[in-house]
């Protein structure tokens, strides 16, 4: 956790009405703790995003972190990119997230230029991109908008550029889906979340975060035009794909 982060207890007490999950200041204040205790493998994914950016960011190009939240992937890229003339654009539609992310970026001493924008990533112009990151972001975009978003990203990428897509997955095999869901819930329990917290968070987020199968993601990326689509990380029902233009 960073110095401004608190422990996530948003759903620790019973809620008479569990509303939809939103990325407001209440979530921003506990977000690093929430992610660490809720998403298995998150720190590994962030570290490897930095490493892949170091490998594939080209001189005088732009890297995008779409749905950047507090800038974890942005910082991972910033700390590893060595190519000259590279800049990073971080985008999030939560003003609370962007406000806090600016504080995080301003406190960082690395010199790769970073621009943060508060806007809908469906409206973000993509150009001259060598690396684009969607780190647990697409799952919050309405299904009917996902194809057009990826098509817009693809169109703005340079040949040889990469898209890193991390997502929570669902599985066609009911037994496997039940198994990994149970293992994920146990992961959260071992990290200190109560059954009440897990149940209320699930209620809040079930119509906000809409997961899809790995096959669906791969097919969509191929349909958009990516020439190579590969799974590079998976832990339970959390995975990350790298797609090459």
UniProtKB/Swiss-Prot annotation:
Binding residues annotated for S-adenosyl-L-methionine, in chain numbering: 42, 67-69, 92-93, 120-121, 135, 202
EC number, UniProt record: 2.1.3.-
Pfam families in alphabetical order: Methyltransf_25
GO molecular function, one term: S-adenosyl-L-methionine binding
Keywords from the named record: S-adenosyl-L-methionine, Transferase
Keyword Transferase recorded: yes
Family annotation (InterPro entries): CmoA (IPR005271), Methyltransf_25 (IPR041698), SAM-dependent_MTases_sf (IPR029063)
PANTHER family tied to this protein: CARBOXY-S-ADENOSYL-L-METHIONINE SYNTHASE, TRANS-ACONITATE 2-METHYLTRANSFERASE-RELATED
Homology family: Belongs to the class I-like SAM-binding methyltransferase superfamily. Cx-SAM synthase family.
Descriptive protein name: Carboxy-S-adenosyl-L-methionine synthase
Name of the gene encoding the protein in the UniProt record: cmoA
């Amino acid at each position: 956790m960073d110095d401004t982060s608190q422990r996530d207890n948003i759903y620790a007490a019973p809620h008479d009405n569990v509303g939809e999950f939103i990325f407001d200041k209440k979530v921003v204040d506990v977000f690093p703790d929430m992610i660490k205790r809720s998403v298995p493998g998150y720190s590994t994914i962030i570290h490897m995003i930095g490493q892949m950016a170091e490998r594939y960011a080209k001189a005088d190009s732009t890297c995008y972190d779409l749905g950047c939240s507090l800038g974890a992937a942005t910082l991972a890229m910033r700390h590893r990119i060595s190519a000259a003339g590279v800049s990073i654009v971080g985008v999030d539609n939560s003003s609370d997230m962007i406000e806090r992310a600016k504080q995080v970026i301003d406190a960082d001493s690395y010199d790769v230029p970073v621009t943060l924008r508060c806007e809908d990533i469906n409206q973000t112009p993509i150009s001259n991109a060598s690396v684009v990151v969607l780190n647990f972001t697409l799952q919050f975009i309405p299904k009917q908008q996902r194809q057009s978003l990826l098509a817009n990203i693809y169109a703005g990428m340079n040949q040889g550029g990469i898209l890193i897509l991390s997502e929570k997955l669902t599985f066609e095999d009911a037994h496997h889906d039940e198994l990994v869901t149970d293992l994920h819930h146990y992961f959260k329990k071992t990290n200190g979340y109560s059954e009440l917290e897990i149940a209320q968070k699930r209620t809040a987020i079930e119509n906000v975060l809409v997961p899809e199968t790995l096959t669906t993601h791969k097919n969509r990326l191929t349909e958009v035009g990516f020439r190579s689509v590969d799974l590079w990380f998976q832990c339970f029902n959390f995975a990350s794909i790298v797609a090459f233009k």
